[in-house]
Amino acid sequence: MEPVDALKQAIKANDAAAVALALEAHPGLTSRLDEPAPGAAFGQTALLAAVQQTNREMVDVLLRAGANINQKSHWWAGGFHVLDDAWRAPWMASFLIGRGAIPEIHHAVRLEMFEDVRRMLSGNPGLVHARGGDGQLPLHFAQTVTMADFLLDRGADVNARDVDHESTAAQWMVRERPDVARRLMKRGAVTDILMASALSDVDIVTRILDADPAAIRMAVNKTWFPMQDPRAGGSIYIWTLGANKTAPAIAKELGHADVVRVLMDRASAGMRLALACERGDEDLVRQLLAARPAVAATLTADERRRLADAAQDNNTAAVRLMLEAGWPVDARGQHDATPLHWAAYHGNAEMARVLLQHQAPVNVKGDEYNGTPLGWARHGSEHGWHRKTGDYAATIEVLVAAGARGEE
């Protein structure tokens, strides 16, 4: 085992004694502690990994070995500091500051260090526009309405976007800090139908639909939220609301019945059917089909891609219901991938069987990577989101039995 791998495994195991032994056995590692740790996300250092484990003893071992407590991660969009993770435990901020961590304005805002924020901005008003981890601004970190108002009153741009997700503070806050997001809306934050639905604002939802009835089709995907920088990780809505979510799905999930009624009154028959399928509501699917047996023939492009989105979300029940309702089996979604590509990528043998029973093309290409479902299965088994839980052997067996060929 390489020395750096021994250190990596010790940190991953949250074992301070093993970290100390690795550093003692391989003194050369001490000069590399501030470099990106091999295999770590976002250019993370060993010390940042220890902080995320909330392991005081391990932090002290690394500091004694020479790790710089103020070294940020090596991340293109804006490095992360140890204090970015200080919220993980009540004791952590004072512990890290006591060992030399220097708070920046983002940390002071996040930790509600109000007097420190006031002092920093008095000394340098321009700090209200300073960028931190992921290129977020201080306003992105505001946990309370009071802090948000304080920053806005001192020149914070309510619609400024971070670097990695190209998203506003309100978009970051919409689920976990709804009261702050509502305040930002009142103070001029750009609002879309997804945000208004998540925050249960019937008036804004109605106003948006009156101005643009097509807005109801908005979904959390690259079509609606394209990134300007190819390195960007995608809209923060992917994490705060959920990939591929629509306004009706969001309102339903959050229990906003009034918003759901407004949205469903405006939704097309195809959208209503897609939502019923996505929720696995077989009775409602049957009712909708009884009322409109030929609805599948009227699906818009956005509605057709809901099948690919359901496959991307690993929602086998939705895929089955959509196919039974007449969705085209070769609909394409993100990366121009078909549902079978996604089933293969997730190692979902059951979904693959269902799709193939509906004549999904087994050797189809044409996605952004020009790969076949078989190629996606092989890639997913090593790098996929479900590589630890997916049944890739069975999925590949299903594909091969259906005539899948190796990549040419």
Task: Place the predicted regions along the sequence by residue.
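Start-of-repeat signature of ankyrin repeats
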Residues: 3, 43, 76-79, 135, ...
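Ankyrin-repeat-protein effector appendages
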Residues: 1-6, 90-111, 119, 178-199, ...
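N-terminal segments that cap or nucleate solenoid repeat domains
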Residues: 1-39, 111-131, 200-216, 272, ...
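Ankyrin repeat A-helix N-terminal signature
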Residues: 9-14, 49-55, 82-90, 107-113, ...
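Conserved ankyrin/ankyrin-like repeat signature
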Residues: 18, 57-58, 91-92, 116, ...
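Ankyrin repeat boundary/linker residues
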Residues: 34, 40, 73-76, 132, ...
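Ankyrin-repeat junction/capping positions
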Residues: 30-31, 37, 70, 128-129, ...
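Ankyrin repeat domain, specifically the short helix-to-loop turn at the C-terminus of the second helix
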Residues: 23-29, 61-68, 98-101, 121-126, ...
